[in-house]
Amino acid sequence: MRVLIAGGGIGGLTTAIALRHHGIDVLVLEQAPVLNEIGAGIQIAANAAIVLREFGLEAAMHAVGVKPQSYDYRDLRSGRMLYQAPLGDEAAARYGAPMYNIHRADLVQLLSNAVPAEAKRLGTRCVAVSQDKDGVEVTLQTAEKVRGDVLVGCDGIHSIVRNHLRGEEEKHFANILMWRSLIPAERLEGLNLEERGNYWFGPGRTLITYWVRPKKLYSILASVPAHEVQRESWDDSGDISEMLRSFDDAEPRARKMLEQCSSVFITGMFYRDPIDDWTSGRITLLGDAAHPMVPFLAAGAGQSIEDAWTLARVLSRRQDDIPGALLEYQQRRLPRTTRIQAGARAAVKLMHESEPPRVRDRNGRWKGMARIDPLAETSWGLAWAYNVVKAVEGPPGEVLNTTGLREGKRLQRVEGQRAFDLWKYAFRPEDVSRGHDGLRAAYDRFLTTNFPLLEGVSAAEDELGDVKAWCVSAPGTLRGNVVLHFHGGGYMIGSAKGSLEYASRLAAAVDGTCYTVDYRLAPEHPYPAAIDDAVMAYRALLSRGIRASSILVSGESSGGGLALALVLALRTAGDPLPAAILAVAPFADLTLSGPTVKAFNGDDPAANRDLLTFMGASYFQGHEPTDPLVSPLFGDLAGLPPLFVTATQGEVLLSDTTRLAERAQKAGVDVTLRLVEDSVHVYTIFPFLPETKTTMEEVAAWARRKLRRNETRPQAAE
């Protein structure tokens, strides 16, 4: 087999090395006459270092590069530490290899040295490609035609090979320009720049800086809004004074560091949207040709290197079925690269927030993450905690997709799989890339599209005190019982309007009315905003003459945790307690210490450790996550009203439910626990599931026993 590789950058050279490592003949076709790179640093994380180790190149990389001890996040103006991600030996033990910072030219050189001269043709530009049943053909600018069995497009974001497969496609500008520079060590004396990722974050701008040659050469990447740079070309040397103006208010150490730049060049931050197909017959794409991404998460080169190993491995196993091998390569890689593309864009958005309230919210989230994720696995693990050498030996379906779900995970029943798929496709890559804004919009779309309010149901906007809510009554309800319901969404997404259909079934279950509450959401409104709103809403019901003995407090996921926290707060304040609590898969432990958070991570289409960390930290921020009003699992549960709690076997938050039920029972609470099989997180919001019908019937019977009829039928506020 002979594989033609279009492009001799990091992806192309690594592909050549990987294929030769597996005994496959290669020819790299590179248009540049010399393999060199513009002076810049590059980060090679554990996921990529593991592959280079297989080639015997890690020692060479270690000899010329730097192993940073941490990523230190600082405020650009004050220099105050915001967050620290430990690296060094600690990260090497955690991820299987260290992180390396290296000069891009040094990396290209060591890769090029591993590819013999006869396997490279430089100064050779590809202008056309074609294929037939027997092989592929590349036409060069000289009109020479080169034949092979496989063509791999490693020719970057402007790929000729991609254009052949897919036609011209739009690439997107992130409206960010990056100033890059390399500074000799002698110009940085006295600045105490340790062998760490020294990062500064300001409104709409960042400084990503680190050593690329030990105590010899320092790399700076300064990102700024595009409108702050006035020039016709973004590809050559820039005006240093223009860069410095963008960092006028930087703290002294950062400012002095920038002043040591003797030359800078500018690049734009571009990307393409994820695609669902990059292979056709004997031709495939790799690296930026397939999945160009913004340069964050230390992921761009790493994904190319992972691609290269996967491609080589599957081709070596399926040499008699080249098209099938290339499709398997795509199947194994596409879910992961799509996830990294979306995650990198989300990181860019997060780190370039420009409005002061959003900067405050982001920094608050980092405070929270430092409490429950001190090793920064949520921030970096999605890219780094992956061993492609091991993964390619397992089933393709084990790879995690955009939402952190194992791509091949399936349920046994048709109805269960229907609910599973609704969760699986609720959040698109574009939604994820927009951070909590995108997740919020997507979750409301998911709920309102799939669970519309049925005809005949009365739903009206209301206010409980100062808290917005919806009042829902199902047809034919007669009693004056009331459900006070709190929607789920990790305290960060979700809305009362999105839960109207479920609220109508809750109202029917108690033969009364359901108020679903629009409590304030994080990160804009961290703790105690949600609990304050919950208390106000409950007291507003009492002020309308509704008896506590006729109120059922309800919630799913974070809403279930909030319902429990509400009752704890009411007990402490001496308020009358509601008659009962319904908690569906409650998010009751925001420290994420439950064993199923780890055990079922990747099996749950609705929740995973990274998402729960992001959401939980957004809510409690600088507050203690073990506070029972944040994590009611840690509260004194004695004296709570009767509790009906339910969850699905195999879901991430299962252990929150089971531990809560166990602790409540030990405290003397009247507990009803129902666990269902082969289902999904907060299964009760899916009205078509048989287990939903069964559970809601049980809840109705249970509620009849626990609630006392209210003498005054509740009315919406005028």
What are these regions (language model features)?
Residues 435-476:
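N-terminal cap/lid segment of alpha/beta-hydrolase-fold proteins
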Residues 1-3, 20, 45-184, 227-241, ...:
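Conserved N-terminal helical subregion
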Residues 399-449, 712-718:
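N-terminal targeting or regulatory segments adjacent to alpha/beta-hydrolase or S9 domains
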Residues 63, 313-409, 428:
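C-terminal helical "tail/cap" subdomain of flavin- and related membrane-associated enzymes
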Residues 461-718:
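Alpha/beta-hydrolase superfamily serine-hydrolase fold, recognizing
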Residues 8-33, 152-153, 179, 209, ...:
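Conserved mid-domain beta->alpha element of the FAD-binding
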Residues 195-229, 244-247, 269:
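Active-site substrate-recognition segment that forms the wall
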Residues 6, 153, 286, 553-555, ...:
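Short beta-strand immediately N-terminal to the catalytic nucleophile in serine-hydrolase-like folds
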